[in-house]
């Protein structure tokens, strides 16, 4: 089964290694450095004291860079709406949630960098 058919039939798609090692390292380093330097600590539950960023220029460029690859895999044209990233710290828990209902029909989740054990993403 090709990616586009799987996406149409199941409503999700896993695209392994969509970012190269060096680009992934660069984006991950940017996220951690931005969190360390800028802070932008959020108080929103359930993520108190966790750095979060909306419309970060590097992430906006990453979105534009990945768009053709994701459109090709999904077999459809997509309209990017927003970028948002958060740097989780030890002890943080990401509960089941829906990404901004009404603002996005499809979401992309990327693990850019990690320390310690793998933190699974459930669909």
How would you label these PLM feature ranges?
Residues 90-123:
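Catalytic core of non-heme Fe(II) oxygenases with the double-stranded beta-helix
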Residues 1-74:
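Non-heme Fe(II)/2-oxoglutarate
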Residues 12-14, 84, 107-111:
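Conserved hydrophobic/aromatic beta-strand scaffold that supports enzyme active sites
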